[in-house]
A protein has these predicted regions:
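Glycine-rich, low-complexity intrinsically disordered segments
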Residues: 1-143
């Protein structure tokens, strides 16, 4: 076991065979819905609870906007052409040697929201684009 916990600023994203740099990745959550049930003859004054279906929340990616890089928009446009391109995406948290320590694998992802950077005449920051994806499952592996 390591002496120190992993830092969260060292990560890489495999975007369908291509490694892409991102400023931030969020939404790597696992959640299960809860089913509540109570029958009329129950002596308890509360509902019984049991696990239900898995809820797959969306994952959000943020990165700088680059000249001649229209990948997010091109992928988003496949929705409007009725030929949605689904991708498998792998996010890896890296250890001190740059090797994957924890890996999240996102299955059958497709874009649902694309946000361009806000523009400010007096701004002093990098233009950031944001892509939100829906998916059909997330697994976590400790390497």
């Amino acid at each position: 076991m390591s002496t120190y916990p992993l830092v969260k600023f060292a990560f890489e994203v495999d975007w369908g065979g291509t490694k892409v740099g991102f400023q931030e990745v969020s939404g790597l959550n696992l959640e299960v819905g809860v089913i509540e049930y109570r029958h009329g003859a129950s002596p308890d004054f509360s509902k019984m609870k049991m696990p239900g279906l898995t809820v797959n929340g969306n994952v959000t990616f943020k990165r700088g906007t680059f000249k001649s890089d229209n990948d997010f928009y091109a992928w988003f446009q496949t929705i409007h052409l009725n030929t949605v391109e689904r991708r498998s995406i792998t996010i890896s948290l890296l250890d001190e040697n740059g090797e994957p320590a924890v890996t999240w694998k996102v299955k059958n992802a497709f874009p649902v929201k694309l946000l361009s950077s806000d523009l400010k005449a007096e701004g002093n920051e990098v233009a950031i684009e944001t892509l939100e994806i829906a998916h059909e499952g997330l697994t976590i592996e400790n390497n």
